[in-house]
Amino acid sequence: RYKLSRKLLTLGFRSLNEHNLLETVLPHLRDLRDQVKETACFGVLGDEKGIFIEQAQGHHTFRFVLSPGKPFELHCSAPGKAIMAYLPKTVRDRYLSYMTFTRYNSRTITSREAYLEELEKVGKLGYAMDNEEELSGVICVGAPIFNYTGYPCGAIWISGPKDRLSKEVVKNTVKA
């Protein structure tokens, strides 16, 4: 005799919700990609890190390609910061307890205090940036996606080389 475990049921429902969310997000990903000509991505929170779900490939020869299911760091990525800034404090604290603040280069946020300051800025601005914090030469701009209850259920972001993502492009992306 077999029965579904609670964890498996939870994963199934999470997957169902992500699928419906993906159907809603995909046209916006494509629009964003078409506006800025860079790869536009969508991801959600996993158990301890973010999880990349889907992308609309940029139009340039050099572009970023990610595999669905690939985890991303929360402390040095635009989507991670965008989601974390809007989580309820208790949920945010749980994720913070898992974080190791791995240093990738001199721009990486490496302390809880600095990260919380960054999240406060993100909350005021409404969007997050990864300004070469994980990969030198790469900039990401991301914003949270909220469900019908106002909970940050994911993020949408663009990634590209810093030479192509000028301040003007970033400003236009934020407006989009």
Model-inferred region functions:
Residues L29-K37, C41:
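Short regulatory alpha-helical segment in sensory/regulatory domains of signaling proteins that mediates
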Residues F42-D47, A56:
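Short hydrophobic alpha-helical segments used for membrane anchoring or interfacial signaling
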Residues T110-A176:
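Extended hydrophobic
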Residues T61-E134:
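Short, solvent-exposed recognition segments
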Residues R1-E18, L22-E23:
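N-terminal helix-turn-helix
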Residues Y2, G50-I51:
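Hydrophobic residues embedded in beta-strands of well-ordered beta-sheets
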Residues R6, G46, G154:
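A cytosolic small-molecule/anion-sensing beta-strand core signal
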